[in-house]
């Protein structure tokens, strides 16, 4: 004969109060979120922007907090510039603004009117690759290719700014661009080839 399982009044009260609390929490949390949403998520401040990217002028409306990286990838669909760390530590998002390299994840789009932005898509001349792009192919300056656009943009700046007198100087200039695959020797060789 099977023993009948009995539940005490105390067990019933504990179980039902925990269950009712879980039923109440989501509604209360949503109500609290709705009350605080205006303080947590500030409204977008859309502003008109006229920016020149790869020698082409764009007129767009963008949130004043939009980074250059997000403007390029999300709004203009120029996806050659990569989002790596989104904290300015890996160099995958490197582009040129008025000929100087910048990390597009740390640059606000609102700072760009009147400036010229060049991305990896703007380096080539039609179907003719930039000499640095050709050198990266010839010297195996990439492996998986994810960091390559940022590496090439920094490498072009390295040559243009004259940081090519020694391997140590090239490595120092390029130290802000990380390559998880370890193609650093090919990258340095590519820069030296273009610098000749």
Which residues are covered by each model-predicted region?
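Bacterial Sec-dependent N-terminal signal peptides
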Residues: 14-32
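C-terminal segment of N-terminal export signals and the immediately downstream linker at the start
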Residues: 26-61
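Short capping micro-motif at the N-terminus of alpha-helices
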Residues: 60-62, 104-105
